Amino acid sequence: EAHTVVGEATGLRALDMLSALVSRCDSGCLQRNPIATWNLLAGGDSVALCPFAYGYSNYARAGYGAHLLEFGALIRTAGGKPFRSTLGGAGLAISSRCRHTQEAVRFCEFVACANCQRTLYFDSGGQPGHRQAWLDAEVNRRSNRFFANTLQTLDESWLRPRYDGYLHFQDSAGPVIHAYLRNQASAEQTLVEMNRLYEI
């Protein structure tokens, strides 16, 4: 199984679990991305819970939406085992074409330091990446404890793969899984197609 994205038994079980989760969600869940989902929760009363999506701390800040959202750890299996998420996000880099490298390096050092992350960066609406900001009492007070409540999920996550070809696979396999969740393909067909895409 060296050229498969996942073994058959594990893959079929994962697809079955996704299907079970989606069957308990409102019908619009397959049309929304996480931001649209948080907008729905923060802006109305038709949905009260999202069990599994990437977090955006601005929805946990007073005044951002009609409803202040509270974030927590990921859902658990019936046996109590926690699910794990991928850790991705935006980064900060310096282009090889940069003509002011030293200034760019100093800016990156400044914006990524703990003090900036827990003050200016957060105050400006940013979602900090520095652990000290996630543990900061004032940052958590002003974000309805978003960071403290989700830190364990971050600690238990796995880093999104960065190898050449992975993003193409992710972009291509997503619609395949989506079709399965809309009952347009069997789990077996879905797994075969995902493995085909993984070999490309």
Predicted features along the sequence, with ranges:
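Glycine-centered hinge/linker elements that transmit conformational signals in sensory
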Residues: A2-R32, L74
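Acidic/polar loop patches that form or flank catalytic/metal-binding clefts of enzymes
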Residues: R24-Q31, L49-C50, L68-E70, R118-Y121
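Extracytoplasmic/periplasmic substrate-recognition and gating elements
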Residues: A62-S124, P175-H178, R182
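Short helix-initiation/N-cap motifs at beta->coil->alpha
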Residues: G28-A42
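Alpha-to-beta junction loops
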Residues: G43-A53
